[in-house]
C-alpha cells in the first residue's frame, strides 16, 4: 500500500496514517509529497496494489473535458491528467485499488475512468475531513477482515451519513 499525503498544515492526516498503519499484513509505504515527480517516482519504485492519496482536491470543468486537481500543498495544484500515464503503468503492474481522499473528486474519476483501475474511490463533494476518515476506517476494517471490496465499500458508505444528505454514492 502506497500512501501519499499532501502537506497542508490545515489538513490533519494523522488519523488517516494511524488507520493505514493498523492494517494487518500490509507493507505500508508513506510519504508527504511535494511535487508531481514525487508521485511519479513512488509509483514507479513501489508498484503498489493499493494507492491512497490524501489532500485537498477540486474538479475543474473545461470546454470539452473535466480534470481533477490535488493540492500537494496550498500553493501546488496538480492536475490528475498529468499523472494519467503513470497511473496506467501502475495498473499494468498490479494496482488494484485507488482511494483519493480529496474533496470534489469527480474530475479525478473522470480522468482515470479509462485507465481501468479495478476499484477507484473518490469523494464527489466537499466533505468534512472527519467524515472521510470515518469512511476510510470502516472501509479498511471491513476489507482487512475478509469482506469483498465492493461489499466493504457498501457497508462503509452505509455507516456514514450527515443529516439527510448521502455524501458517498456507489
What are these regions (language model features)?
Residues 58-61, 83-86, 112-117:
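Short amphipathic alpha-helical segments, especially helix-boundary/capping motifs
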Residues 1-77, 111:
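A domain-level signal for caspase-like cysteine endopeptidase catalytic cores
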Residues 71-104:
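Caspase-like (clan CD) cysteine peptidase catalytic core
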Residues 92-170:
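Active-site-proximal C-terminal subdomain of hydrolase catalytic domains
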Residues 22-25, 45, 88-92, 145, ...:
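Secondary-structure boundary motif
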Residues 65-78, 89, 145-146, 155, ...:
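Mid-sequence, gly/pro-rich, charge-dense loop/helix-turn segments that line enzyme active sites
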